[in-house]
């Protein structure tokens, strides 16, 4: 791994970060690790996507186990997710023997909900080889792949394949052994925070930071479906503060308006379950989106992102310019003012349209000596606030020339400029 001296200056470290290295070991003169420098820029790189505060939201179609244990159905869902505009698809991988403490007849002693879950998983889980086959199909679409490992063997299987990123389920937020295992692999991590208390979130964040993990936290309400009153998108702000990282939203509510609102509140990662039939057997189908719903969500998220814009100084948009002319007001002369006369307040009125000098310039106009004749009802212009008058010049061209014009101003332009042609807008 690349290292830097313990006394490396910020510029040296920034050069590492500019190369896409998020964590740089700092060593003393004996080569011993003494600290870890981390890129404080909120950037997460998953596959071909770089996720940051300035990037579009990274939208994940969570297929999970909605493939019903069928490789062909899983591939179909991938194809539909691609058509729906997802940036990535995500699956779940479990080693049932490593994950559950009891199997077979011994599960009779478990809670009914656990028995139901075990039954579904035993019927609908894909093997490692089957999952690899589905991953290969995803690669044909040049789409990013993520997966949730539920146990150590699954982590290793995903690493062996070359997975681009891993998701930690809410149920494993306090599974520090799994967190350390995934963090040690150097892969980007998305960590859901459902079913957790804040002190548990803080504890896991401390573990991830100490491990040098590259991660984002997802606000999540782990109920199926999640009541809207419990979603609490505002908590994303607190997660960003706790994690000092990018935040996102993993939704289990019905519909897709909440993820759109999450993006408006700053979520840079969105995860929603994906299915073709909400009546299929399994916990996730009822809170999943159909392909046409997912596509609508993606489109509306992109529209909202475009509408959010930036906090840069405001400028008049192209669409506003015409309305500014048509609806705004200008300073106009109430009488004929001859060149050399001093403009008084009585000489000026405020009238539409907004083709001339704006009304807020009235104080600068009053008291000025006119450098030109102004007819009654004519506009004043910015040039009337300057001492040097722009003089007319006649140009000659050796080819036909024209002007882009609007309907309301083409007549005076024809009379004054005499172009060979006009282009109407």
Question: Where on the chain are the PLM-derived regions?
Answer:
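Short, structural beta-strand-to-alpha-helix junction motif
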Residues: 1, 7-13, 116, 197, ...
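The conserved cystathionine-beta-synthase
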Residues: 2-22, 26-28
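Short hydrophobic beta-strand motif reused across regulatory alpha/beta modules
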Residues: 34-39
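Catalytic cores and adjacent flexible loops of soluble metabolic enzymes
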Residues: 40-425
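Compositionally biased, intrinsically disordered low-complexity regions enriched
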Residues: 1, 14, 18, 414-422
């Amino acid at each position: 791994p690349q290292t830097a001296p313990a006394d490396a200056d910020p510029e040296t470290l920034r050069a590492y970060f500019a190369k896409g290295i998020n964590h740089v070991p700092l060593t003393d003169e004996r080569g011993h690790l003494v600290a870890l420098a981390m890129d404080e820029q909120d950037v997460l790189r998953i596959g071909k996507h770089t996720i940051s505060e300035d990037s579009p939201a990274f939208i994940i179609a969570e297929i999970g186990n909605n493939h019903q244990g069928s490789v062909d159905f899983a591939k179909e869902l991938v194809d539909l997710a691609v058509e729906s505009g997802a940036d990535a698809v995500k699956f779940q991988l479990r080693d049932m023997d490593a994950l559950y403490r009891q199997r077979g007849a011994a599960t009779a002693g478990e809670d009914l909900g656990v028995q139901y879950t075990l039954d579904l998983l035993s019927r609908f889980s894909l093997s490692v080889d089957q999952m690899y086959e589905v991953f290969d199909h995803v690669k044909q679409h040049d789409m990013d792949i993520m997966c949730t490992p539920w146990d150590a063997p699954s982590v290793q299987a995903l690493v062996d394949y070359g997975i681009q990123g891993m998701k930690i389920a809410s149920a494993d937020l306090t599974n520090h052994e799994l967190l350390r295992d995934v963090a040690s692999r150097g892969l980007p991590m998305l960590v859901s925070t459902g079913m957790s208390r804040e002190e548990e979130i803080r504890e896991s964040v401390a573990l991830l930071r100490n491990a040098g993990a590259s991660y984002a936290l997802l606000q999540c309400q782990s109920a199926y479906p999640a009541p809207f009153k419990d979603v609490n998108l505002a908590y994303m702000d607190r997660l960003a503060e706790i994690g000092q990282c990018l935040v996102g939203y993993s939704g289990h509510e019905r519909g897709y308006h909440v993820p759109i609102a999450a993006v408006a509140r700053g979520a840079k990662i969105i995860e929603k379950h994906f299915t073709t039939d909400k009546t299929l057997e399994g916990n996730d189908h009822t809170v999943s989106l159909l392909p046409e719903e997912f596509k609508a969500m993606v489109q509306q998220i992109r529209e909202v992102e475009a509408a959010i814009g930036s906090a840069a100084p405001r400028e008049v948009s192209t669409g506003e310019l015409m309305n500014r002319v048509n609806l705004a007001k200008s300073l106009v002369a109430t009488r004929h003012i001859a060149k050399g006369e001093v403009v008084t307040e009585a000489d000026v009125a405020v009238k539409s349209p907004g083709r001339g000098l704006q009304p807020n310039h009235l104080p600068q106009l009053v008291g000025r000596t006119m450098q030109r004749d102004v007819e009654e009802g004519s506009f004043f212009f910015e040039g009337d606030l300057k001492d040097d008058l722009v003089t007319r010049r006649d140009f000659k061209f050796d080819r036909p020339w024209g002007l882009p014009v609007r309907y309301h101003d083409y007549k005076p332009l024809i009379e004054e400029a005499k172009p060979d042609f006009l282009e109407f807008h």
